[in-house]
Amino acid sequence: KGKRKPRSIGEIVKRESIRPKHGALLFRLTNYFKSKNILQIGTTMGLSTLYLTSYATGLRCIALENVPEFATIARQAFAKEGRNPIDLRIGNYKDLLPQALNDINSLDFVFFNTLYEQHNNLWLFNECMKYAHNDTVFVFEGIKASRKMRELWEEICACPEVTVTLDLYSLGIVLFNKKLHKRDYIVYF
């Protein structure tokens, strides 16, 4: 009693991975916007990365992960699916992000799977925003998971560069298209 039982990889994957309907949405978004330069911050063992990159070949994806054990599982998943061109980088996000942004140069799609990085999220958003263009899409996971994440989402919605936000309760989608009027939508998903 009181001892923690070690969890199996299957239990960890089930708890930490993206839900299938959210993964399908990521696939549809990257497909619809024809994203060629994708950045993922936090891989959740690679499943969300596979959703992001499965719509086409010839795209560039840099995935950042700060948990080495998750990165090992992600790398195995990429190899199993034949997705070796995914550039997986392991380490602290604050150290990895500047070089990743410099390498990718222009962001088409960014998936922030950074629920456990709440203290860095605003910095990550602001750094990525410097490389955003009119057709860039940002997706945040866990926007209602905690008070800090809700506050972050409110700050993102208030950002003047952001034109449209979609609050899907557990996911948040951010658009920067200057042709669109500033709107914040709440959508049941």
What is each of the regions a protein language model found here?
Residues K1-F111, L115-V139, I143-F189:
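A short alpha-helical cap/connector motif
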